Amino acid sequence: MNQTAYLGELALDSLRKELNSRPVQRLFLVRGNHSYTACGAEAALSPIFRELGIQVTEFKDFSVNPKMEEAQLGVQQFIDSQSDTILAVGGGSAMDMAKLIRHYAAEQGIKTVLMAMPTTAGTGAEATHFAVVYVEGKKQSIEAEDILPDMAFVYPPFTYQNSADLTACTGFDALAQAFEAYWNRNATEESTQYAMKAISLLLHQLPECVAHPTNPLRDEIAMGAYWAGRAINITKTTAPHAFSYAFTSKCGYPHGHAVALTFPFFAELNLGKPGLCQYFSNYVKQIGLTYNGVGSHDLDAILHEVNLQRLANNPIPVNESHMKNLFLYLTTTL
């Protein structure tokens, strides 16, 4: 699996050059519904499309947690548009939707180029060969080589307008990915290098970026998110992500927030350092990711809806004793 990545201030011009050199004639743009305009992407990209004479078909009719029926609708609209390239511009949802459309179109014999340009700093979806889709309310992770975008364009200015809450949620998702790649059963020398690079760009910068954002801080967070994505593209995620899915699908926690709920507990368990749970409990509270209960749902049942595939990557097998302690942690510490 190979990908060309353009990182930093020159990524926007690199996108223009790639669109021009191919050349792209019909573009299927998978984008966020409101974020595309709010982050400045529309103002930056529309002149490029006009200049190059590219016919653009937009697709934005999908949920924050993309559903299979929405992906199927996207595939049909992509086929009808006769586009030669798919460009995803948005957060994790837009990335996943574009990846799913390319994948399922390929199953019908229609192959195309996929480009990805994130407008949030966190999911790292522009750098992975996984895509998330919800089938009858349950989260599924689709994995295939053609899900990895052919090109990633990480242009930090598109993240400059992200709210504090969005910065916290997506940024912590990236930080968790980096740590989960680091302690992963599948860790390699390459993935560990990516994970450590991501941690160095995220750990101390994220709380400051949430409280007092600056463009240089956001640049670091965007780069950290990309390298975290590169790391989990090799290792996949572990327990914090495995337990997060039901908190999102059943209780409505945003993905990064859901990951943060159990991360402190597993950080201490997996790294074996006393006090680490308390450190990260304070950390997630500092950036506003607190535990707000599970509404009418039963917490024990939520915890037992764990994703066993991701849980299998955890370096320490999770048993019922751990589950009881995790339940106690959530109800007494956060």
Question: What is each of the regions a protein language model found here?
Answer:
Residues 104-190, 277-279:
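A glycine/threonine-rich phosphate-anchoring loop and its flanking beta-alpha core
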Residues 276-334:
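C-terminal charged capping/lid subdomain of soluble metabolic enzymes
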Residues 181, 185-282:
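Active-site segments that bind and position negatively charged phosphate/pyrophosphate groups
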Residues 63-65, 93, 101-104, 119-123, ...:
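Acidic, glycine-rich active-site loops and adjacent beta-strand->loop/helix elements
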Residues 78-119, 243:
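A short, small-residue-rich loop immediately preceding and capping a beta-strand
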Residues 12-15, 38-40, 68-69, 93-100, ...:
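Short glycine/serine/threonine-rich phosphate/pyrophosphate-binding segments
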Residues 1-85:
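ATP/NTP phosphate-donor binding region
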